[in-house]
């Protein structure tokens, strides 16, 4: 594997972490204490940095950054061609105690001072330079992070700065009134997880096929646009997440290319807003869930939808909300969750606990949040009773446990899958039979389809289900669905009926699988080891089929404890990764 790109991406991320801060525009406290050691800010000044509405408890520590020196604007003939505001090339992280006293950070990685990247050579021609990147990297690698005495730590930071730049803090400051700026520390640490992952990948001697496919320079073979018969008679299209509208032509063409056996493991979908990319992604997820239940039912997939963009994540979370019963609207038992307290198909992996009332959330790898509340064997009988009541009411059955329910569901699902194949064959024969007979394929067609019912009989049987017919009648009010060719009309009918049914049957199968796995798990002996943690993720995936996270947060969730390593990456644990707004990643 060519690792040059990995090194480049890592360095770009490191540079972004060391970007310049516009401290003149931020809430700050300015200390003008000459050559004295900064040891505190006044207690009354703390709200200037941490407004009262956003403060933690009064007895909690807070993270701050201190700028001990300033790069002043340079003027010539009364004007400057460069930055005309002060800039701060060096930042020291610290802890602010409740009384305003400064303390060395508890986390050793936060004790390493930050040289802002734009001031280190090589840099842009119009940026000023304080030191070289190579020299700074060497000095930082030798910096002592064990020191906890504030006075000695501050002295070590100044020595580091002087070794790199040849200047003291006092010499790079206002001549008459030197100042030290204190600001709230930015939210940090997310990028560190990604940087750690880069380091492990750069050291790894194992094969990582998907990553190798992404970074190799060889151009992929372009797939041809599929023929109409392949588009509308797609025999691997088994599921739809929505039963209200069928796929559009472009969505159906894209799905045909995606499910083509020769398709790459990395599949890009482009299109302006409003062209149906989200609906297509929902179809991919629905299809994957159904295929998994029917083809390897004992191994639930881990599906992740991710993005670098917070707004995109919010949109994804909304897309996986399950419609709840409301006044005046009849309850559709099929499309409700058959486990208590669930109104979504998506689990949000994020540490933002202020959003816990909006979404089902997992805050960390310990499972704080929804997992620890829900993934609880003590609630097993509650789940089993709730599920069986919904299951037996919907199917008019009398199943006694989740395993019986799964057998019942999978039998029905296989029958529906076969029915989809029959419908496509019948529509294909009706539309293309004469054309193929003219080409001499009649005898083979007759042998293949001699046991098939007629197209008219298939449609008649299909319309016996009042719900299907009602949805179809609403659709054909629109001219685009009237008088369609047989295969296109059949594709529309299947989207709003059998494919939609299969998706929800698969969801309810996975709910039963969650109950079965919860009954068998040993929560007391469960660890964060590779096997236990992967098993827990799969169990959660039975309840929440889609995990949703930003790319900044995701790496910290996909780690386990392995051979004494507390953050060993779970390589290849994700079965399907969907990247929204991928151009921003």
Briefly describe each language-model feature range.
Residues 244-265, 549-550:
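N-terminal pre-P-loop "Q-motif" helix
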Residues 1-99, 103-106, 346-490, 494, ...:
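Charged C-terminal transducer/switch regions of large nucleotide-driven machines
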Residues 312-342:
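Conserved helix-turn-beta segment of the N-terminal RecA-like "Helicase ATP-binding" lobe
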Residues 1-236:
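N-terminal accessory nucleic-acid engagement/regulatory domains that precede
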Residues 568-585:
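SF2 helicase catalytic motif II
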Residues 197-243, 450-573:
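Conserved helicase NTPase catalytic core signature
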Residues 285-290, 319-325, 561-566:
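Short secondary-structure boundary/capping segments
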Residues 267-286, 296-316, 548:
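Conserved RecA-like ASCE P-loop NTPase motor core of nucleic-acid helicases/translocases
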């Amino acid at each position: 594997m060519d690792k040059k790109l990995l090194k480049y991406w890592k360095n770009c991320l490191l540079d972004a972490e060391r970007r310049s801060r516009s401290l003149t525009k931020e809430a700050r406290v300015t200390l003008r204490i000459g050559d004295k050691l900064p040891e505190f800010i006044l207690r009354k000044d703390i709200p200037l940095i941490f407004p009262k509405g956003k403060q933690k408890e009064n007895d909690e520590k807070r993270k701050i950054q201190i700028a001990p020196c300033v790069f002043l604007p340079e003027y010539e003939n009364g004007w400057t061609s460069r930055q005309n505001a002060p800039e701060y090339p060096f930042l020291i992280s610290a802890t602010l105690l409740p009384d305003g006293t400064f303390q060395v950070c508890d986390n050793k990685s936060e004790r390493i001072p930050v040289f802002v990247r734009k001031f280190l050579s090589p840099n842009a021609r119009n940026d000023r330079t304080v030191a070289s990147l190579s020299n700074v990297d060497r000095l930082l690698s030798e910096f002592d992070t064990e020191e906890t005495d504030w006075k000695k730590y501050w002295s070590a930071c100044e020595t580091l700065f002087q070794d790199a730049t040849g200047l003291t803090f006092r010499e790079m400051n206002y001549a008459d009134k030197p100042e030290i700026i204190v600001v709230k520390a930015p939210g940090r640490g997310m990028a560190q997880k990604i940087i750690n992952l880069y380091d492990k990948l750069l050291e790894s001697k194992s094969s990582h096929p998907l990553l190798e496919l992404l970074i190799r320079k060889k151009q992929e073979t372009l797939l041809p646009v599929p023929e109409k018969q392949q588009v509308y008679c797609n025999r691997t299209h088994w599921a739809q997440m929505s039963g209200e509208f069928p796929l559009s032509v472009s969505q159906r063409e894209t799905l045909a290319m995606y499910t083509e056996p020769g398709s790459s493991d990395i599949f890009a979908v482009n299109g302006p807003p409003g062209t149906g990319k989200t609906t297509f992604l929902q179809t991919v997820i629905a299809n994957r869930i159904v295929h998994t239940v029917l083809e390897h039912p004992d191994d639930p997939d881990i599906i992740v939808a991710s993005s670098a963009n917070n707004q995109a994540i919010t949109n994804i979370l909304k897309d996986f909300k399950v419609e709840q019963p409301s006044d005046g609207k009849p309850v559709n038992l099929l499309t409700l969750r058959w486990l208590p307290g669930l109104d979504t198909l998506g689990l949000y992996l994020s540490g933002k606990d202020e959003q816990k009332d909006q979404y089902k959330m997992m805050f960390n790898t310990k499972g704080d949040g929804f997992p620890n509340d829900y993934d609880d064997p003590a609630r097993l009988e509650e789940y089993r009773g709730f599920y069986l009541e919904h299951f037996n009411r919907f199917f008019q059955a009398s199943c006694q446990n989740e395993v019986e329910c799964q057998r019942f569901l999978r039998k029905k699902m296989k029958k529906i899958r076969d029915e989809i194949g029959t419908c496509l064959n019948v529509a294909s024969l009706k539309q293309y039979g004469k054309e193929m007979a003219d080409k001499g394929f009649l005898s083979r067609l007759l042998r293949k389809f001699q046991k098939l019912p007629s197209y008219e009989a298939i449609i008649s049987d299909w319309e016996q289900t009042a719900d299907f017919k009602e949805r179809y009648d609403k659709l054909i009010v629109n001219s685009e669905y009237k008088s369609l060719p047989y295969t296109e009309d059949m594709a529309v009918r299947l989207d709003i009926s059998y494919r939609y049914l299969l998706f929800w049957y698969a969801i309810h199968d996975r709910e039963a699988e969650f109950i079965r796995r919860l009954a068998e798990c040993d929560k007391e002996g469960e660890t964060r080891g590779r096997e236990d943690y992967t098993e827990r993720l799969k169990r959660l995936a039975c309840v929440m089929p889609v995990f949703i996270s930003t790319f900044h947060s995701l790496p910290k969730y996909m780690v386990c404890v392995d051979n004494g390593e507390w953050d060993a990456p779970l390589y290849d644990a994700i079965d399907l990764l969907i990247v929204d707004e991928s151009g921003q990643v």
